[in-house]
Amino acid sequence: MLQIGEDVDYLLIPREVRLAGGVWRVISKPATKEAVFRERLIQFLQEEGRTLEDVARIIEKSTPHPPQPPKKAKVPRVRRVPQMVTPPLRLVVGTYDSSNGSDSELSDFDTSKVKGNRGSGKTRKVRKMPVSYLGSKFLGSDESEDDQELVEAFLRRGEKKPSAPPPRRRVNLPVPMFENNLGPQPSKGDRWREYVSQVSWGKLKQRVRGWAPRSGSEVGQAQQSSIAERAGEMRHSHTSPDLDDSSRNTGDLSDQTLITRRWKPKIKWVSLRRCRKEQVPPLAHGTAEEPPEAAENQGAGAAAEHGVEAAASQRPEAAASPRAEAAANPRAEATANPRAEAAANPRAEAAASPRAEAAANPRAEAAANPRAEATANPRAEAAANPRAEATANPRAEAAVNPRTEAAVNPRTEAAANPRAEAAVNPRAEATASPRAEAEVNQKTEATASPRAETAASPRVEAAASLRVEAAASPRAEATVSPRAEAVATPRAETAASARVEAAANLRAGVLPDQRAEAIDSQRAEGPVNQSTGATENQRVEVLADQRAGVLHDQREEAGPQAILEASADSGSRARKQVKTVRFQTPGRFSWFHMRRKAFWHTPRLPTLPKRGPRAGAGEARSLRVLRADTRADMEHREQEEQL
């Protein structure tokens, strides 16, 4: 009778132990039951006039002394292949870690003979290869390590870092017991790499049946690189993702490491807007017919982006000068070109500056200031007023004001020059409200016809309907296909000039650039139109507000993404890449769910034993299946042991 501590898991108590005289069955009972049992036993013995010693003697006598194996049904469990000779018993000194019952050496060596014990399944199912080492060099290594090494590995389990990668000793060198702390200890990654390099890649791949690299720049290209590099490459890609990323940024680093991966930029659409703002301006510079406008586009973009301050400065000037010109005159004139220029120039700058200002008080001042200047008076009113309002509730009021219409409109007008053209007309119409008036110049163009219609009415409707309608007005079209048509439209032409690049790109489907340029110039223009200060903010507002002018700014609001989509919709519908999964074959991971078809002949990684048939399942399975199952199980187990 063994006394067992309270929190011991009964499942971990071996069912039988080989001790002197053979195999002892261990009957464990919870302490309470145990106490009851002893009490009753003693009571019984007293009645019988016997003592515990007598009982012990009787038991002793009744036990066949050379313990003959019970003639029980040990038969099914007999191995078809005679079992390997069990290794001579070694004293394994180590702690028994009951949390890892499967690793106990005791049950491994001591009960390896006792196949029969059903109960010992828990302990008997010892993996020769402790689970903790599945990922290690033992996994695929071709040398069959002798048990000695495995035992050492098991005992080494606790130590966090072995002083060297696990000894690959063919020759038993004396191993000094002190750790050489001289060099820096290899990191976990280094050790893993050390392991991996000892496994031939081909072997590993054979082992892991369905294995294929994660499709991705890393491993995919790693495979193309020569096998020699492969291990190193895997090493790097696995160990130092951070190093890798940094190397991604710093070109030289990646060259130092032997990774010759092509650098594929990771693109997030959000970043596109920024990039476009920064890059397109130079593009605009080169491309735009009017470098100034391109510059201002830049200004719009850059200013819009960076420089609310920059915007502030540029915008006021641009707003004041070009905007005034562009707004009053050029808006209409500039429509074709000046609009681009005006757009680019005043808008960019106007965008930049008022944007910046607009940023601060932006709409109000920026609007008031550049818009006022730019717009002359109406813009000033529209700007100051609706702008201020627009600033506050820019879109909402803007919606009320043509400014909203204009705001959406500017988009529209920005999109379609008609707005510029319309500016004169619809602006008159749009003129209804100060913004409209203010925008009459600018927005009138913007107002165009749909704009005009839309303009007076809610910009928002205008936006929505306009965007819808927008089909009607180029902006609408431009909206729908806005940039594409915008290309068609003067504004587009303006865009075409300023955005020629953009225009071409523009709806053409060079979304990003076009959008960027469109964004820059139109932003410049659109914002100028919409709100002098609106450029960046307007875009933002336009986002917010034009969201009011939703359709419009759906593009805006969706931002580059929407931009992309919108123009993808219009211009490059064909170009939009949809990733379809063509064949749903049992692909890379079939090995995972088709596991049951184990191939008896292939060496398998140790798996948990299949559970015996459940209680209810008996009827369902024919005996034949059961027998096959058992046989498979036996073979599996024996293979495991050989492994």
Swiss-Prot record:
Where in the sequence does UniProt note compositional bias of the Basic and acidic residues kind?
Answer: 230-247, 626-643
| Span list, region Disordered | 93-124, 156-191, 206-492, 519-540, 553-577, 603-643
Where is the protein situated, by its record's location annotation? Cytoplasm; Cytoplasm, Cytoskeleton, Microtubule organizing center, Centrosome
| Residue numbers covered by motif PxLPxI/L motif | 603-609
Q: Spans of biased composition, class Polar residues?
A: 218-227, 248-259, 528-537
UniProt modified residues of type Phosphoserine? 141, 144
Give all cystine bridges in this chain. Answer: none
> Any one cellular component term from GO for this entry?
cytoplasm
Give an example GO biological process.
regulation of mitotic nuclear division
- UniProt keyword list: Cytoplasm, Cytoskeleton, Phosphoprotein
Which regions are flagged for Basic residues bias? 261-276
From start to end residue, where is composition biased (Low complexity)? 294-399, 409-432, 459-473
Q: Entry's InterPro entries?
A: Coiled-coil_p8
Additional detail: Despite its name, does not contain a coiled coil domain.
Q: Provide the function of this protein.
A: Core component of the 3M complex, a complex required to regulate microtubule dynamics and genome integrity. It is unclear how the 3M complex regulates microtubules, it could act by controlling the level of a microtubule stabilizer. Required for localization of CUL7 to the centrosome.
Please describe the quaternary structure of this protein: Component of the 3M complex, composed of core components CUL7, CCDC8 and OBSL1. Interacts (via PxLPxI/L motif) with ANKRA2 (via ankyrin repeats); may link the 3M complex to histone deacetylases including HDAC4 and HDAC5.
Query: What's in the domain note?
Result: The PxLPxI/L motif mediates interaction with ankyrin repeats of ANKRA2.
Q: What is the protein's name according to its record? A: Coiled-coil domain-containing protein 8
Organism, by scientific name, is Rattus norvegicus (Rat)
Please name the gene that encodes this protein.
Answer: Ccdc8
